[in-house]
């Protein structure tokens, strides 16, 4: 095999050189036509030798070794007691299989073997998987294994995301400077503040235009993501698991496999990167829309909270069926002593106090009106006021014999303890065996502190256990769907996505807040995996009051549903909701398969968000006025992503009523206009003057 390996797919190339004995990524980016002079490329990438530097050029490969002259954090950090902290790996073998290449390297002195696997998918997404094996007889402690990829020197900005509970994934963009911009997650889960993806971008890159390089970690535990520019001017991105003290100690012939890093390049902006990720995920055989359409869901939490009553819930089921709901979900409060949030977690047995005849009667009622039944669990958690905790207080994560501080009046079960694991699995499995349950909402409502298994740090074991739990429950109950919820928008990542079928995007159903939460979460996660519900007129989370149209239009852009006491909805409300669910069902094939587009705008007061069919035959857009416009006449609405050479019929549709405007007359095109795709994207159409916190839908159909 040549020293140079060229992977290319879908307009992306990755070129790796092993001439120096270590794999070095020479290029990750725009596709390079095969047949180029490999030797010439290698020569162009040999560093000069400045004064006051190493006497010979040093090749810094993917392992970033100090032994090769790299002055910075190496890819692998670890040691044996008093030795083998510095490494020098040499490639011993490489295997090319289509667009996947695997390198195995050995450091004979340190008695370590490392493997790096580069897979360039059909969608042009690069998956980098690495692992280290201890070939020695003594133990080797792994401190970290972080995967790094170089990006061009002309990258200018970092785009990543911050947040908090009920305001997740808010963008922040800043200049790349010398040093390291590091984002660490230490909650034991992917937190509300987690970035999900981190981009390095050319200076002018936007949603629609320019080059972007992004890294996302396929992992649901502690993590680190970074962008680094060294003093010599080289820039790289990295991601990996954040390991706690002695969390990974390898005995002889044991292996640590780091979480896969998912790397995406696009030369057509953030939306181009997003499209590659969505396409990759949708190509999975297990992707939910490859199995069935996404059903309209009613979750009754905000309708009843802990006040469970059969007659009330039966009336909700009747109302839900009337307006076209397809799935009914009973949330918290059905089990053990769970009459409030301070007791009962851990006792996954139907409460005789609330449901003396069991849940079967309610399930039968829900099924009788044509709805699926779903049920809420929070199996990783336990209240100290529970039968489980009283019997097994040692089954919680804890270090030093201390009980960790309570968080939402609960503790975390140590699922690495097989007894605790089997307790949760068996009680959950028993409920699923007894009742016809199509779907479970699985919550995770606290951070992990002092997360130890018998005193040893065990975040990794906890994450592996929940992956196992979901997989075993689904294997035992084919067709079961699991929604991952973690106080709403936590634990949304490319690790959990292979084990769950849906994410609860945020506990915040306020439509104004959801505009940005939904928009930026969907950069990585396809909208069909993101729960987006219409809440009541007055949001329980913020107290804001919004029109039906704004709430309904906002909730359309995901796996749609409701959180509303429908028994209190008026006849007009129910008619609106029936119209909206009918429209969602008519458009969900488009919404859940098309290319997501986010038009660049000159104002931050409004935004255009859309989905374009893969064949560009149709599209649906949302124009949202978030706050009052900067101008008396807002900037034009541009409909991006259409076929530039085709003509489209463009019109406003109002399945949930009209947006409230501040204008004597609407723009002339409202009832329909035929316009070329090129003009719709470049010139656009005059925007209406909407009141703040309003949104409208625009259809485009090729004619």
What residue ranges belong to the model's regions?
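Polysaccharide-binding surfaces and accessory modules of carbohydrate-active proteins
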Residues: 3-14, 22-228, 647-661
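Carbohydrate-binding surface patches
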Residues: 11, 199, 602-644
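Conserved, mostly hydrophobic/aromatic
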Residues: 11, 130, 253, 298, ...
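Glycine-rich, aromatic-flanked loop segments that form ligand/cofactor-binding clefts
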Residues: 54-88, 207-223, 264-288, 325-332, ...
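Short Pro-Gly-centered flexible turn/kink motifs
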Residues: 248-267, 693-700
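Aromatic-lined carbohydrate-binding/catalytic grooves of carbohydrate-active enzymes
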Residues: 291-426, 439
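Active-site neighborhood of glycoside hydrolase catalytic domains
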Residues: 356-358, 392, 396-549, 559-564, ...
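C-terminal beta-sandwich/jelly-roll accessory domains of carbohydrate-active enzymes
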Residues: 627-703
